[in-house]
């Protein structure tokens, strides 16, 4: 990987996100990923999706950032499938050569029809 600040992007979260039904879809071997990352201090960020919600966590100096969906949002910290009323969104990043970064979430004001009685997606 070299010494340059590095960002890694995944689809599935590498650990639980405190949502019982989503926590069944994490990486199957997260400890292997963590072991590699701990040997490469230039990794500053790990980005992931799948959870359709904003999520921030830090572990051993690495920031893990979950990203909302450009479609429907899932209710954070829910025990079963549940939709959130938040608008679709996405995460933006500014990455700097010195390894610093900033991030924020943008929401799209789109009033889509939600089926709040849905039991899956």
Question: Each predicted region: which residue ranges?
Answer:
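His/acidic metal-ligating clusters that form di-metal
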Residues: 1-65, 119
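Binuclear metal-dependent phosphoesterase catalytic core
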Residues: 36, 58-121
């Amino acid at each position: 990987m070299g010494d340059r600040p590095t960002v890694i992007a995944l689809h599935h979260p590498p650990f639980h996100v405190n949502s019982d039904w989503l926590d069944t879809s994490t990486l199957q071997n997260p400890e292997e990923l963590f072991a590699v990352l701990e040997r490469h201090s230039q990794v500053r960020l790990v980005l992931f999706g799948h959870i359709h919600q904003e999520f921030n966590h830090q572990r051993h100096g690495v920031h893990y950032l979950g990203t909302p969906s450009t479609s429907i949002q899932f209710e954070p910290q829910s025990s079963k499938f549940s939709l959130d009323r938040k608008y679709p969104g996405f995460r933006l990043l500014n990455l700097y050569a010195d390894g610093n970064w900033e991030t924020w979430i943008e929401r799209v004001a789109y009033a889509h029809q939600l089926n709040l009685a849905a039991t899956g997606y």
